[in-house]
């Protein structure tokens, strides 16, 4: 099943190898800012003289998204959906819908809450049209746990992102990568809850739910196992992983994280 996009998050201090923090393979946001507004900033900064006029930016995200939607072309309408009362998600979905339209796709928007079930379990819109394919900015694990989750196994419609992305978006991927490639310079030591720690005594570490969004329920511990920082959220009941703590570089009052964007299987920009 085809995929659309994802974002790998890296920490880099400038004098040591870049470290992979996690892979947002299912519902990455900040796409609109990275693909569109970041490019507007570049053009404004050139004009104002903040940066040289020949300065460039590694950013082909929008072009690659449009190209990818062209590759996924079908005469069937492409539905785009997210939850109600989620302004950031709505903006991201509208942006992706616009990219699809630029690629020649017929697109329609519908809220997740308005999706219906027709005869035989087919997915329908508010006009009872059968939905054949849809992009959803809605976590796959939530879909699987919904009352109608078992219908996903019957695969009557094509979802973007596809079901296999639920594996890559699971932060359990990080301990597995460390197990397969121990000591890799671009990985952080990681382990599952209940396993032996993969860092030396006295080193700081992080606890993360295997599924979470925007840092929800992430906890930072110092080398004496004291909580240094904690983010509340809705994911406290998820299984946890542990990961060596990697501080982000600080510039003034800001901490910088590299979001490396991937469209299909091709890196195409940072933001």
Give the predicted meaning of each segment:
Residues 1-27, 258-261:
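Conserved metal-phosphate-binding beta-hairpin within the catalytic cores
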Residues 13-15, 30-33, 38-271:
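Domain-scale recognition of functional cores that engage charged ligands
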């Amino acid at each position: 099943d085809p995929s659309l996009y994802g974002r790998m998050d890296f920490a880099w201090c400038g004098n040591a190898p870049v470290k992979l923090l996690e892979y947002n393979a299912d519902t990455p946001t900040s796409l609109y800012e990275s693909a569109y507004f970041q490019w507007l900033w570049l053009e404004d900064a050139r004009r104002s003289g903040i940066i040289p006029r020949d300065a460039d930016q590694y950013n082909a995200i929008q072009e690659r998204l449009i190209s990818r939607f062209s590759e996924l072309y079908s005469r069937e309408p492409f539905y785009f959906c997210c939850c109600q009362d989620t302004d950031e998600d709505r903006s991201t979905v509208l942006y992706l819908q616009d990219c699809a339209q630029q690629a020649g796709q017929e697109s329609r928007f519908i809220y997740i809450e308005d999706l219906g079930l027709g005869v035989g379990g087919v997915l329908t819109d508010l006009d009872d049209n059968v939905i054949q394919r849809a992009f959803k900015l809605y976590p796959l694990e939530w879909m699987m746990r919904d009352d109608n989750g078992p219908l996903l196994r019957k695969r009557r419609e094509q979802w973007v992102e596809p079901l296999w992305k639920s594996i890559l978006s699971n932060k359990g991927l990080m301990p597995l990568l460390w197990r397969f490639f121990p000591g890799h310079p671009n990985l952080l030591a990681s382990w599952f809850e209940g396993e032996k720690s993969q860092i030396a005594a006295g080193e700081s570490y992080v606890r993360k739910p295997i599924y979470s969004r925007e840092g929800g329920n992430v906890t930072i511990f110092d080398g004496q196992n004291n909580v240094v920082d904690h983010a509340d959220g809705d994911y406290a009941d998820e299984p946890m992983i542990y990961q060596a703590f990697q501080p982000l570089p600080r510039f003034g009052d800001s901490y910088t994280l590299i979001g490396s964007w991937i469209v299909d299987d091709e890196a195409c920009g940072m933001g």
